[in-house]
Structure formats: structure tokens, C-alpha cells
């Protein structure tokens, strides 16, 4: 079963969104 570009895009979003929020939260806490 091949991996489509859509699946890659969804996987990237799934990985990046929590990381983005963690980074944003970390910056808020470091103030």
C-alpha cells in the first residue's frame, strides 16, 4: 500500500500542531 501526499500532509500537521502549541506555551511560561 503506497503512501499518498495527502497522508504525508496529514501526518505532518498531526506532528507540527502539538509542537507549535508546546513551543508557544513554553515561550509564555518563560516570560
Curated annotation (Swiss-Prot):
The keyword Phosphoprotein does not apply. The keyword Membrane applies. It is a single-pass membrane protein. GO terms for cellular component: chloroplast thylakoid membrane; photosystem I. Its main location: plastid. It comes from the Eukaryota. Pfam families: PsaM. The chain crosses the membrane at residues 7-26. InterPro entries: PSI_PsaM, PSI_PsaM_sf. It is found in: Plastid, Chloroplast thylakoid membrane. GO terms for biological process: photosynthesis. Keywords: Chloroplast, Membrane, Photosynthesis, Photosystem I, Plastid, Thylakoid, Transmembrane, Transmembrane helix. Belongs to the PsaM family. This is Photosystem I reaction center subunit XII. It comes from Euglena mutabilis.
Amino acid at each position: 500500500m503506497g503512501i499518498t501526499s495527502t497522508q504525508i500532509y496529514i501526518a505532518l500537521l498531526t506532528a507540527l500542531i502539538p509542537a507549535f502549541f508546546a513551543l508557544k506555551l513554553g515561550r509564555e511560561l518563560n516570560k
